[in-house]
Amino acid sequence: MYKSSENINRFTEEIENTFWDDLEKFNFEKIKREVANLKKEYFSFEDYNIFIKILKRLKADKRKNVNGLYLNFYKFLLNQKKEIERVRQMYNFDKYFGNYIYVAGTDEVGRGPLAGPIVAAAVILNLNYVEDKKLILGVKDSKKLTQKARYELSQTIKEKALSYSIAVINNKEIDKRGISWCNNEVLRKAVLGLKLPVELVLSDGYAVKNLPVRNEFVIKGDSKSVSIASASIIAKVYRDELMREYSKVYTEYNFQSNSGYGTKEHIGAIKKYGTCKIHRLSFLRNIV
């Protein structure tokens, strides 16, 4: 793996000076592994000349299976270019609102479930990226990602964020205050939990009340804003993990699968076993 800048530079030297110039000396499996490593680590189109060299070597090789790697890698680069352009647009969207240094995106998950808390996250990213390598590729609306992709992106976002914050309001408070108040409050708490002086808050769908800084709401923000999408991913992963832990205590309700939402199976379990300590009783008046 070529994670550090030192390793990236060394890998670049290897590409330019050894392996790809002597491709015929290596067997197919070795070449296949090297192409796979490129896909994992080497996606920046600032390295365009290196990619062209590799493609030419793969295409010129006399082995058909190596030529197949050329087509595979070429398609990968085209898709990667589209992804870089898509994510660039999401970064640029957040920069459009003004010359701010610290822009926070915030989003919540868990407004509608019958059980468990509502969770929000707020994220500040470095929007002034210099290289494509600095972009968080793959970021999008958390609902459009697989569980595995969400988890991996959540880890990457936390590592690259300038600051992030997670806020939680439990089911008891939801029953006491109502979901609308809790929805706003959990977003507000997430923003106020950031460790940097926020200048602008971008929120998904509607404004967050009682914030001390400028707030712009964005319709379908988790598809347009990199900061909102990042917050959406962190919040979703955090809540899903929490519900999996609850499922170990309250085994009857299959929380690890339904995350507390009102699936047919979940409602059936409530009718059979009654409620547990994390159910939102105010949501169950027509069920129990």
Swiss-Prot record:
Q: Which HAMAP family match?
A: RNase_HII_B
Which Pfam families does the protein's record reference? RNase_HII
Lineage at the top is: Bacteria, Bacillati, Bacillota, Clostridia, Eubacteriales
Q: Which organism is it from?
A: Clostridium kluyveri (strain ATCC 8527 / DSM 555 / NBRC 12016 / NCIMB 10680 / K1)
EC id: 3.1.26.4
Q: What subcellular compartments does it reside in?
A: Cytoplasm
**What does it catalyze?**
Endonucleolytic cleavage to 5'-phosphomonoester
Alphabetically list the UniProt keywords.
Cytoplasm, Endonuclease, Hydrolase, Manganese, Metal-binding, Nuclease
Q: Which GO terms describe its biological process?
A: DNA replication, removal of RNA primer; mismatch repair
Per the record, the major location class is: cytoplasm
- Function, please? Endonuclease that specifically degrades the RNA of RNA-DNA hybrids.
PANTHER family of this UniProt entry? RIBONUCLEASE H2 SUBUNIT A, RIBONUCLEASE HII
Q: Which Gene3D superfamilies match?
A: Ribonuclease H-like superfamily/Ribonuclease H
Annotated a divalent metal cation binding lies at 107-108, 204
Cofactor dependency: Mn(2+); Mg(2+)
Any single Gene Ontology cellular-component annotation = cytoplasm
Stated name of the protein: Ribonuclease HII
Q: Which residues cross the membrane?
A: none
Q: Which family does it belong to?
A: Belongs to the RNase HII family.
Q: State the PROSITE patterns in the record.
A: RNASE_H_2 (PS51975)
Sequence ranges assigned to domain RNase H type-2 in this UniProt record: 101-288
